[in-house]
Amino acid sequence: MAEQCPPKRVVGAKQTLKAVLNCKVAQVYIAKDAEEHVVKKIKEACEEKGIKIVYIDTMKELGRMCGIDVGAATAADVIGER
């Protein structure tokens, strides 16, 4: 059974990659200070699928944008099923 795409925004590298691969994603946010090995697959998948990447200065700032109290390397705006 296919996984349902979450509404609105997902946070974190694993959830972002899953959304990019399985859902319609409007854009992906990546913190500039995130470690490259954490975001590499996400960047590649976005490039392959033509998804816009928005770079945010820090993980802390991205976490705050997503309404969480810790830093986040990535997040994605999900707009529906692929």
UniProtKB/Swiss-Prot annotation:
Q: Which key words are in the record? A: RNA-binding
Gene3D superfamilies for the chain: 3.30.1330.30
InterPro entries hit by this protein: Ribosomal_eL30-like_sf, Ribosomal_eL8/eL30/eS12/Gad45, RNA_bf_YbxF-like
According to the UniProt entry, where is the signal peptide? none
Has the keyword Nuclease been applied to this entry?
A: no
Q: What single Pfam family name could you report for this chain, choosing any that match?
A: Ribosomal_L7Ae
- Extract the GO molecular function terms from the UniProt entry: RNA binding
Q: Which SUPFAM superfamilies has this protein been placed in?
A: L30e-like
Protein family membership: Belongs to the eukaryotic ribosomal protein eL8 family.
This chain belongs to which protein, by name?
RNA-binding protein TTE2299
